[in-house]
Structure formats: C-alpha cells, structure tokens
Amino acid sequence: MKAMKATKKAMTKTGLAEALAPKPSSARRIAPPSSRAWPPSAQEVKKTGKLIIPGLVMVKTRKKPATKAGKREMFGKVVLVKAQPAKTVVKAYPVKALKDNF
C-alpha cells in the first residue's frame, strides 16, 4: 500500500482546537465533543490524507491497489478469488505518548 500524497498542509493544533470549539450557533443543542470532532476530522483526512490528534491517535489514508481475479493457493487448496477494485483505506494508530502510558 502506498501513502497518499498530501495535497495541502496538515491541520495544526490551533486549527484542531478551533474546529472542536463550540460554535455560537450550536448553543441550543448540547453535543458531546466526539460528535463535534467528527465532521472537521473527516474533512481533514480527505483533504490531506493525515490527521493527528495530539496525545491520542494518528489517522492516515493509504491507497490499496486493485487485485486481479484468479486462482490462489490457500492452505494447500486452490481458491477462486474475485477481482477487487482499488480503494483508499483509513487506518488509525496510537501515538507514542499514549503507548508510553500503558
């Protein structure tokens, strides 16, 4: 799998804080921080291919190439495999600071 090339600069800590800050228009409904974080995070990953939430997680996208249909040997048996289209895979990794705490 190849890493996607960043098209724009990644979001900074300040930009992330501003995206997660409650907006004045949303004063009527109280939403948990996780639901407020999702739309800006998804947009950032689509735009740059990478998102780091400091101290918690790093989210990266990878391009997985298409596979051809055919026969493959698995555990001594021949298995027919369907062709799969190319796709983008999103993976999340814990950052070092989180790993060190456990």
Curated annotation (Swiss-Prot):
Biased composition of type Low complexity is found at 21-42
> Does the entry feature the keyword DNA-binding, yes or no?
yes
The keyword DNA-binding is assigned to this record: yes
SUPFAM superfamilies cross-referenced by the UniProt entry: IHF-like DNA-binding proteins
GO MF term list: DNA binding
Here the segments flagged for biased composition (Basic residues) are 1-11
InterPro entries in alphabetical order: IHF-like_DNA-bd_dom_sf
What cellular component terms from Gene Ontology apply here? Answer: nucleus
**What's the protein here called?**
Major basic nuclear protein 2
Which organism is the protein's source? Crypthecodinium cohnii
Q: Which gene encodes it?
A: HCc2
